[in-house]
Swiss-Prot record:
Residues 48-69 are annotated as: Disordered. InterPro entries: DNA_gyrase_inhibitor_YacG, Znf_NHR/GATA. This is DNA gyrase inhibitor YacG. Interacts with GyrB. It comes from Pseudomonas syringae pv. syringae (strain B728a). Pfam families: YacG.
Amino acid sequence: MSQPMTVQCPTCDAPVEWSAASPSRPFCSERCKLIDLGAWASEEHAIPVSPDAEDELFSGDLEAPHRGH
């Protein structure tokens, strides 16, 4: 039988077995999972995007709706 894969908890670096027996994976615990969620909510973590990306995404929201008369 093969050894289960082990990963590091992203919050505390504790080893975590990657299996169904570890329901919080990749975190070692629900506490570490909530700490990470809080970091995303307070914008300590962010996905990098180009400065113009947001403008492109929402530029259509600023345009007046077209009316077909």
